[in-house]
Amino acid sequence: MAKESSFDIVSKVELPEVQNAIQIALKEISTRYDFKGSKSDISLDKEELVLVSDDEFKLSQLKDVLVSKLIKRNVPTKNIDYGKVENASGGTVRQRAKLVQGIDKDNAKKINTIIKNSGLKVKSQVQDDQVRVTGKNKDDLQQIISAVRGADLPIDVQFINFR
Protein backbone atom coordinates (compact mmCIF):
# COMPACT_ATOMS: atom_id res chain seq x y z
CA MET A 1 0.00 0.00 0.00
CA ALA A 2 2.10 2.91 1.25
CA LYS A 3 5.63 3.05 -0.02
CA GLU A 4 8.39 3.84 2.44
CA SER A 5 9.97 7.26 2.14
CA SER A 6 13.55 7.99 3.08
CA PHE A 7 16.28 10.60 3.14
CA ASP A 8 19.98 10.70 3.94
CA ILE A 9 21.71 12.90 6.50
CA VAL A 10 25.21 13.80 5.29
CA SER A 11 27.93 16.26 6.16
CA LYS A 12 29.79 17.52 3.11
CA VAL A 13 31.96 20.46 2.18
CA GLU A 14 31.99 21.46 -1.49
CA LEU A 15 35.71 21.73 -2.33
CA PRO A 16 35.21 23.90 -5.45
CA GLU A 17 33.32 26.43 -3.32
CA VAL A 18 36.15 26.37 -0.76
CA GLN A 19 38.64 27.01 -3.58
CA ASN A 20 36.53 29.93 -4.84
CA ALA A 21 36.32 31.40 -1.33
CA ILE A 22 40.11 31.10 -0.97
CA GLN A 23 40.66 32.95 -4.25
CA ILE A 24 38.28 35.75 -3.23
CA ALA A 25 39.92 36.00 0.21
CA LEU A 26 43.41 36.18 -1.34
CA LYS A 27 42.20 38.91 -3.69
CA GLU A 28 40.87 40.92 -0.73
CA ILE A 29 44.08 40.37 1.26
CA SER A 30 46.19 41.64 -1.64
CA THR A 31 44.25 44.94 -1.63
CA ARG A 32 43.90 45.48 2.13
CA TYR A 33 46.14 48.12 3.67
CA ASP A 34 46.90 46.16 6.85
CA PHE A 35 48.25 43.25 4.77
CA LYS A 36 50.58 45.39 2.60
CA GLY A 37 54.05 43.83 2.54
CA SER A 38 53.05 40.80 4.60
CA LYS A 39 53.61 37.18 3.64
CA SER A 40 50.02 35.99 4.04
CA ASP A 41 48.73 33.03 2.08
CA ILE A 42 45.91 30.49 2.11
CA SER A 43 46.18 27.19 0.27
CA LEU A 44 44.04 24.09 -0.08
CA ASP A 45 45.86 20.76 -0.07
CA LYS A 46 43.34 17.95 -0.73
CA GLU A 47 41.02 18.38 2.29
CA GLU A 48 43.25 20.59 4.42
CA LEU A 49 43.56 24.37 4.51
CA VAL A 50 46.95 25.90 5.26
CA LEU A 51 46.99 29.51 6.49
CA VAL A 52 50.35 31.32 6.65
CA SER A 53 50.98 34.86 7.89
CA ASP A 54 53.60 37.08 9.56
CA ASP A 55 52.28 36.83 13.11
CA GLU A 56 49.35 35.44 15.08
CA PHE A 57 47.36 38.68 14.88
CA LYS A 58 47.53 38.76 11.07
CA LEU A 59 46.78 35.04 11.04
CA SER A 60 43.57 35.63 13.00
CA GLN A 61 42.61 38.44 10.59
CA LEU A 62 43.39 36.12 7.68
CA LYS A 63 41.13 33.50 9.25
CA ASP A 64 38.35 36.09 9.71
CA VAL A 65 38.55 37.10 6.04
CA LEU A 66 38.46 33.45 4.95
CA VAL A 67 35.51 32.60 7.21
CA SER A 68 33.52 35.58 5.90
CA LYS A 69 34.14 34.47 2.31
CA LEU A 70 33.22 30.86 3.15
CA ILE A 71 29.95 32.03 4.70
CA LYS A 72 29.12 34.08 1.59
CA ARG A 73 29.68 30.95 -0.53
CA ASN A 74 27.44 28.85 1.78
CA VAL A 75 30.27 26.62 2.98
CA PRO A 76 29.62 25.31 6.51
CA THR A 77 32.25 26.73 8.85
CA LYS A 78 31.35 24.19 11.55
CA ASN A 79 33.11 21.57 9.44
CA ILE A 80 36.50 23.26 9.72
CA ASP A 81 38.71 21.78 12.43
CA TYR A 82 41.54 24.23 13.16
CA GLY A 83 44.86 22.91 14.37
CA LYS A 84 47.28 24.77 16.61
CA VAL A 85 49.38 27.69 15.43
CA GLU A 86 52.97 26.67 14.68
CA ASN A 87 56.11 28.50 13.58
CA ALA A 88 56.95 28.27 9.89
CA SER A 89 60.01 29.24 7.88
CA GLY A 90 60.99 32.86 7.34
CA GLY A 91 59.61 34.12 10.64
CA THR A 92 56.02 33.33 9.73
CA VAL A 93 53.34 31.33 11.53
CA ARG A 94 51.23 28.57 10.05
CA GLN A 95 47.90 27.02 10.97
CA ARG A 96 46.40 23.94 9.41
CA ALA A 97 42.65 23.44 9.24
CA LYS A 98 41.11 20.11 8.30
CA LEU A 99 37.85 20.07 6.34
CA VAL A 100 35.60 17.48 7.99
CA GLN A 101 33.78 15.37 5.41
CA GLY A 102 31.17 12.81 6.40
CA ILE A 103 29.58 11.91 9.71
CA ASP A 104 31.83 10.02 12.13
CA LYS A 105 30.52 7.31 14.46
CA ASP A 106 30.11 9.60 17.50
CA ASN A 107 28.02 12.15 15.61
CA ALA A 108 26.04 9.36 13.93
CA LYS A 109 25.18 8.03 17.40
CA LYS A 110 24.07 11.52 18.48
CA ILE A 111 21.85 11.81 15.40
CA ASN A 112 20.41 8.33 16.07
CA THR A 113 19.56 9.25 19.67
CA ILE A 114 17.85 12.46 18.47
CA ILE A 115 15.78 10.36 16.06
CA LYS A 116 14.95 7.71 18.70
CA ASN A 117 14.02 10.35 21.30
CA SER A 118 11.57 11.97 18.88
CA GLY A 119 9.20 9.03 19.37
CA LEU A 120 8.16 8.97 15.71
CA LYS A 121 7.77 5.75 13.73
CA VAL A 122 10.95 6.00 11.67
CA LYS A 123 14.04 3.82 11.35
CA SER A 124 17.58 5.10 11.09
CA GLN A 125 20.71 3.28 10.08
CA VAL A 126 24.32 4.37 9.74
CA GLN A 127 25.80 3.78 6.28
CA ASP A 128 29.51 4.60 6.09
CA ASP A 129 29.62 8.39 6.57
CA GLN A 130 25.89 9.10 6.34
CA VAL A 131 22.69 8.26 8.20
CA ARG A 132 19.64 6.97 6.31
CA VAL A 133 16.22 7.63 7.81
CA THR A 134 13.19 5.70 6.52
CA GLY A 135 9.53 5.88 7.45
CA LYS A 136 6.06 5.49 5.98
CA ASN A 137 4.89 9.03 6.71
CA LYS A 138 6.62 11.98 5.01
CA ASP A 139 5.42 14.32 7.76
CA ASP A 140 7.35 12.24 10.31
CA LEU A 141 10.47 12.53 8.16
CA GLN A 142 10.05 16.31 7.97
CA GLN A 143 9.72 16.45 11.76
CA ILE A 144 12.96 14.45 12.03
CA ILE A 145 14.66 16.95 9.71
CA SER A 146 13.55 19.86 11.89
CA ALA A 147 14.62 18.01 15.06
CA VAL A 148 18.11 17.29 13.68
CA ARG A 149 18.43 20.88 12.40
CA GLY A 150 17.45 22.19 15.84
CA ALA A 151 19.97 19.97 17.63
CA ASP A 152 23.33 21.39 18.63
CA LEU A 153 25.68 19.18 16.62
CA PRO A 154 29.42 19.88 16.26
CA ILE A 155 29.14 19.43 12.47
CA ASP A 156 26.87 20.93 9.83
CA VAL A 157 24.47 18.43 8.27
CA GLN A 158 22.63 18.40 4.96
CA PHE A 159 19.60 16.36 3.96
CA ILE A 160 19.68 14.70 0.53
CA ASN A 161 17.84 12.03 -1.48
CA PHE A 162 14.40 12.80 -0.05
CA ARG A 163 12.24 10.09 -1.63
Swiss-Prot record:
CDD domains on file: YajQ_like
InterPro entries attached to this UniProt entry: DUF520 (IPR007551), UPF0234-like_C (IPR035571), UPF0234_N (IPR035570), YajQ-like_sf (IPR036183)
The UniProt record lists the keyword tRNA processing: no
Pfam families reported for this sequence: DUF520 (PF04461)
Entry superkingdom: Bacteria
Keyword RNA-binding: no
Keywords of this entry: Nucleotide-binding
GO annotation, cellular component aspect: cytosol
Molecular function per GO: nucleotide binding
Stated family: Belongs to the YajQ family.
Function: Nucleotide-binding protein.
PANTHER family (UniProt xref): UPF0234 PROTEIN YAJQ
Name of the protein described by the UniProt record: Nucleotide-binding protein BSU11020
Species name: Bacillus subtilis (strain 168)
Gene: yitK
